[in-house]
């Protein structure tokens, strides 16, 4: 019965995401629509950004502005990546889900600071559909701000931990080595959850 409920919720969210993505190109060029989540069968960590860059929206894939964002560089230091593996397969194969705090917003250019009139994604419902997720990771200060503005801590059960990390964006004036060291917690969480689910 519980699985049926999750399945129905997942189908509803998928319909909304498909409808949402098909409306990606808008007459209002400042209106930016986010992507559907990347998620596999048993995610342990949900990483939330703010809103994808224009390059990512155009390609319908997360963190594609790779000259200005170190996300995949960080992930490749933490997890082994197979030759020729797509970004999405690489992420979900390591029990990570990707999404954003913002579903849609007005934004001129790529800067998160320019986001206005934003509408949040239904992250609470997403976590209900994917009960294996134990930790939400907020990618940067603005993602943290957007998340807590829309979702008070009381909205989540005690089993969900929420942590904020230095932004993977190169706009964050922090050395890569410092970012990598802070982001290692993602690997620790994945490894710990893998052991729990094996027992």
PLM features: what roles do these ranges have?
Residues 75, 146-147:
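Hydrophobic packing residues within well-ordered alpha-helices of enzyme cores
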